[in-house]
């Protein structure tokens, strides 16, 4: 398919005269178009759920979440990877974002990088990609050569491959075990896929990574139990999580968090079972870090 024929490259009839619109009219036009995004993502719920299911299994076996993309898509992948570390207390080496052109491309375009098929393979080889890993390829147009190169190589080593595009029958989808294609329609500004397409990709990434973390036992009821309290705001949040999850007072929550070496999951387990820190850690390990299992079995 030619680039000009892609949905993401079409002109949007609803914004043809946006150049002469007032600021309020601009906001209303963009807002009306953005309302279509959630519905487009909703058409892919079964594929997204499948991605969560399969990725959760690989991650539990020691695999890594590896996001690959160019431009906006690459930056969104890096953002998701980076945020998982403090939110769910995971090893930074288990959530990795790759962008065509390397780290400098995060802040400034690197000409020609996204068109380099071999560069994608090289970047994954440098990470020593293996069959336990999960590779998520992002491309709004569904045709970025760098992403195709990544997915092709990932298939060779039998890693799980997931593609996220904003067009139907995407090129990257041909090289993915699971193809997610949320068609959001033409952008308000023609071809500016950082807008609706970028938002759709971010929503899908939120669902996949959050789902995978939930399945690792990183959430109890609907609160984060593996948050990394690295500053005063997060320490306060950690205490509130313990209060909500166990019903104890603020002072008890704070005291137990300190005894648990600032580990929220361990603190909750201590309060739920009445055991000390060492025993709580053993129990959590037995239950694969899942506090619901701890509560039900102890």
Swiss-Prot record:
Its EC number is 4.2.1.126. GO terms for biological process: amino sugar catabolic process; N-acetylmuramic acid catabolic process; peptidoglycan turnover. The keyword Lyase applies. Transmembrane segments: none annotated. The active site is at residues 83, 114. It holds the Pfam family GKRP_SIS_N. Residues 55-218 form the SIS domain. Keywords: Carbohydrate metabolism, Lyase. It catalyses: N-acetyl-D-muramate 6-phosphate + H2O = N-acetyl-D-glucosamine 6-phosphate + (R)-lactate. Pathway: Amino-sugar metabolism; N-acetylmuramate degradation. InterPro entries: Etherase_MurQ (IPR005488), Glucokinase_regulatory_CS (IPR005486), MURQ/GCKR (IPR040190), SIS_dom (IPR001347), SIS_dom_sf (IPR046348). Homodimer. Specifically catalyzes the cleavage of the D-lactyl ether substituent of MurNAc 6-phosphate, producing GlcNAc 6-phosphate and D-lactate. NCBIfam families: N-acetylmuramic acid 6-phosphate etherase (TIGR00274), PRK05441.1 (NF003915), PRK12570.1 (NF009222). Belongs to the GCKR-like family. MurNAc-6-P etherase subfamily. A lyase-type mechanism (elimination/hydration) is suggested for the cleavage of the lactyl ether bond of MurNAc 6-phosphate, with the formation of an alpha,beta-unsaturated aldehyde intermediate with (E)-stereochemistry, followed by the syn addition of water to give product. This is N-acetylmuramic acid 6-phosphate etherase.
């Amino acid at each position: 398919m030619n680039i000009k024929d892609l949905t993401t490259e079409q002109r949007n009839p609803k914004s043809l005269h946006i150049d002469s619109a007032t600021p309020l009219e601009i906001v209303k036009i963009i807002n009306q178009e953005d309302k279509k995004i959630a519905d487009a993502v909703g058409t892919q719920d079964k594929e997204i759920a499948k991605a969560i299911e399969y990725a959760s299994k690989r991650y539990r076996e020691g695999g890594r979440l590896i996001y690959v993309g160019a431009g906006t898509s690459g930056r969104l992948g890096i953002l998701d990877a980076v945020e998982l570390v403090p939110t769910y207390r995971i090893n930074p080496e288990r959530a990795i974002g790759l962008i065509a052109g390397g780290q400098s491309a995060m802040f400034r375009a690197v000409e020609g990088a996204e068109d380099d098929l071999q560069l994608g393979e090289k970047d994954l080889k440098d990470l020593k990609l293996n069959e336990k890993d999960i590779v998520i390829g992002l491309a709004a147009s569904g045709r970025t050569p760098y992403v195709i190169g990544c997915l092709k190589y990932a298939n060779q080593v039998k890693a799980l491959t997931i593609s996220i595009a904003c067009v139907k029958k995407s090129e990257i989808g041909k090289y993915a075990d699971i193809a997610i294609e949320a068609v959001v329609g033409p952008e308000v500004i023609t071809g500016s896929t950082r807008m609706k397409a970028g938002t759709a990709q971010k929503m899908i990434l939120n669902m996949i990574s959050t789902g995978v973390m939930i399945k690792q036992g990183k959430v109890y009821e609907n609160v984060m139990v593996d948050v990394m309290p690295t500053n005063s705001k997060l320490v306060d949040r950690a205490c509130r999580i313990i209060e909500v999850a166990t019903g104890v007072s603020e002072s008890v929550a704070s005291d137990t968090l300190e005894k648990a070496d600032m580990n929220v999951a361990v603190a909750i387990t201590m309060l739920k079972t009445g055991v000390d820190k060492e025993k709580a850690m053993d129990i959590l390990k037995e239950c694969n870090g899942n506090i619901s299992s701890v509560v039900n079995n102890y």
